[in-house]
Structures are given as structure tokens and as C-alpha cells.
Design a protein with these regions (language model features):
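Acidic (Asp/Glu)-rich catalytic clusters
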Residues: 44-47, 74-81, 129-134, 217, ...
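Active-site-facing alpha/beta catalytic cores
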Residues: 2-3, 11, 70, 83-248, ...
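Conserved, mostly hydrophobic/aromatic
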Residues: 56, 265, 331
Length: 346
């Protein structure tokens, strides 16, 4: 270990290529991933009229309950696959408003232990591998750290750039080189222009430095908007999923001349005021708006929903199996009924 600029350099971590070689995909897993990618892209480019659900825990805290949740999703998917494409959330990096608290499995593969980034890299790859190998699900994760994306780049079918990251140039440029759909959230202050600009950047080609290399990207035509609500100047929650909000985003897309104009609506966060049970009403309201307006139906490709095995949330050290240790989530019974209700109304 050596110290520089008030940073203690503990050890050099393996590069993504080394980790992928040690924990590889089989040929059959690669084929499943490729087929999943195409089915998801087809929704965003309009060649499929299926509805996307990016759904799962706020944070992937332990492998066992996450995989139990995914096993239940797999059984449920069989009932709705003619209408819905399910993309499980396996969020292994968590942004924190103040920088404090549990930062996700990458940092702490054991939430009760000290951070261990090497074990975290292995743990998140093994978890995503298990979801694909055992259940046929390539999943979604948040790109909190652009330089870490390639540890999972061969496993993810959907990537989200969060509200705190969406204005960052490295996130935008990295998104332009990702081969799967990347959702750009509106920023915490709610400026839709910032969100649209981030999509423009992600859909454009760039040359920049990435992981010590000079790289060139072609642009990501599947980059799109995620509406998650925002905090106004007075610190109040403001939602942006309503009928008129969706029409406003549709107008912004028309003016921007972007490819594959699309919106995913996040039913939690500031859209729900972090009242997790509100996600049920919000999800149904958005489906209703789609059914009332052909432009909204064409624009809104799906929902992002936070759910887990148990309702609500708990402290990091409480150890209730399948209960969130970050934001509160819908429990399984409510989740199952909501997905069936959504499918029935599409």
C-alpha cells in the first residue's frame, strides 16, 4: 500500500478481460443473451409492441434472495411473455445522496463486513452469471462507475444512468459505446432538457479516454429517457409520469430529431415520493395513459418497478430474507398481481 493525494492505494484490481476469462459465459449463454438483446431492442425500435418491465430489488444485497426472486419472475414470465418482456433488476452499485451508507454488492459483497472491491467484482459477476445460466435472464444494472461497466458488459441487456450521473460527460460518452439500450434518467432537479441532451450525447459518436485507452464509439441508437420524478427548489417531491408530462417529453423528442424516441417510467423514487405502495397505482395510471393516446403508447415502452420478496425495507443488519436494505420495495404477492394486471390491460 502507498499513499498519494490523500488516497491509500491498497492493491491493483484485475481488469475486466481477466475477470471475464476466469468467469466466462458458455456458448449457450451467449446465444440466450443475444436473443434477449434483440427482443428488447425490438421494443425500443418499434418492431415489437411488447411492454418492458425493468423490475427487481432497489439493490442486490445478497445472492440467495435475489436468485429466489428471479426464479419466481421466471415462472411468472411464462404467463405474460406474449405481452411483456421482463428484465430483472440486479443493481450492484448504489448511488448515495450524501455518499454515506451501503453502496451495493460491488463495494460490500457481505453487507455486514468491510468493503472488499475484489470480492465484490467476483460476486456481482457470479450473480449475473447465475441469473443467465439458471433462469435465462440477462438483466439490468446501473452504470454508477463507467470504468467498471466492462466487468458485466457481456451479461447486461439493459443499463441505466442515474439522476446524479446523467450530466456527467464520462457517463454520456461511455453510454454511446454500449451495445444494449441505455436509459438516461432525468436529473434530480427535473430539467428535461438536461435529460434530452444526455440522450443526444449517448446517440452520437465520440473519441475519448476509457480505462487507459483512446476509444471511438459509434453512438447508441437505443439510448432513451427514464422519468423518475424530481425534487423542486423547495425540496418537495414532484412527479413527472402524468399524461401531460408524457406529452411534453414527446414534444421534446420531436424537436430533437433523436432515433427511437422512447420513455421508461420509474414508478418509485420521486414519482412515488418514495411511498413504495404508490407504485401500483402509478403503473396502472401509465398503462391507462398509453391506452388513451396513440402517441403516448408509441413513446412509453415500459416501466421500472422496485420490488423484492418482502414489502418495505429494513436496516442493513436486520437480516430478513428478501427485504430491501435500501429503498422500500413491493413484496412478491403485490408484484405478481401487478404484473398480471398490467398484462391484462395492455
Amino acid at each position: 500500500m502507498y499513499t498519494a493525494m490523500q488516497m491509500n492505494f491498497h492493491r491493483k484490481l484485475p481488469i475486466p478481460q481477466e475477470v471475464k476469462k476466469e468467469y466466462p459465459l458458455t456458448e449457450s449463454m451467449k446465444q440466450v443473451k443475444a436473443e434477449r438483446d434483440e427482443s428488447i431492442k425490438a421494443v425500443f425500435d418499434g418492431s415489437s409492441d411488447k411492454f418492458i418491465l425493468v423490475i427487481g430489488p432497489c439493490s442486490a444485497d445478497h445472492s440467495e434472495p435475489v436468485l429466489e426472486y428471479i426464479s419466481r419472475l421466471k415462472k411468472l414470465e411464462e404467463k405474460v411473455s406474449d405481452k411483456i418482456v421482463i428484465i430483472p433488476r440486479i443493481y450492484t452499485n448504489k448511488p448515495r445522496t450524501t455518499g454515506q451508507g451501503y453502496k451495493g454488492m460491488l463495494h460490500q459483497p457481505d453487507p455486514d463486513a468491510k468493503p472488499d472491491m475484489y470480492k465484490g467484482i467476483v460476486a456481482i459477476r457470479e450473480l449475473h452469471l447465475a441469473a443467465l445460466r439458471d433462469y435465462g435472464f440477462s438483466c439490468a444494472d446501473e452504470m454508477l462507475y463507467p470504468e467498471n461497466y466492462r466487468y458485466l458488459s457481456d451479461l447486461l441487456s439493459y443499463v441505466a444512468v442515474g439522476a446524479r450521473s446523467v450530466e456527467n460527460q464520462q457517463h454520456r460518452l461511455t453510454a454511446s459505446g454500449i451495445e444494449v439500450p441505455v436509459g438516461m434518467k432525468n436529473p434530480t432537479g427535473g430539467d428535461l432538457g438536461v435529460m434530452i441532451n444526455s440522450i443526444v450525447a449517448a446517440q452520437s459518436s465520440h473519441t475519448f479516454i476509457y480505462r487507459g485507452w483512446e476509444v471511438t464509439t459509434e453512438g447508441n441508437p437505443y439510448s432513451h429517457a427514464i422519468l423518475r420524478g424530481y425534487i423542486d427548489y423547495a425540496g418537495r417531491n414532484v412527479s413527472n409520469y402524468h399524461y401531460e408530462d408524457l406529452l411534453r417529453v414527446e414534444e421534446l423528442y420531436e424537436k430533437s430529431n433523436l432515433t427511437n424516441p422512447s420513455v421508461i417510467v420509474d414508478t418509485n423514487h420521486n414519482n412515488s415520493g418514495k411511498q413504495y405502495l404508490e407504485q401500483i397505482r402509478i403503473a396502472k395510471d401509465i398503462v391507462y395513459s398509453r391506452n388513451q393516446n396513440k402517441d403516448i403508447k408509441r413513446l412509453v415502452k415500459g416501466l421500472m418497478i422496485e420490488s423484492y420478496l418482502e414489502d418495505g425495507a429494513q436496516g442493513v443488519h436486520e437480516h430478513v430474507f428478501g427485504k430491501s436494505i435500501t429503498d422500500p420495495c413491493l413484496g412478491w404477492e403485490k408484484t405478481e398481481q401487478l404484473i398480471l394486471d398490467i398484462a391484462d390491460k395492455l
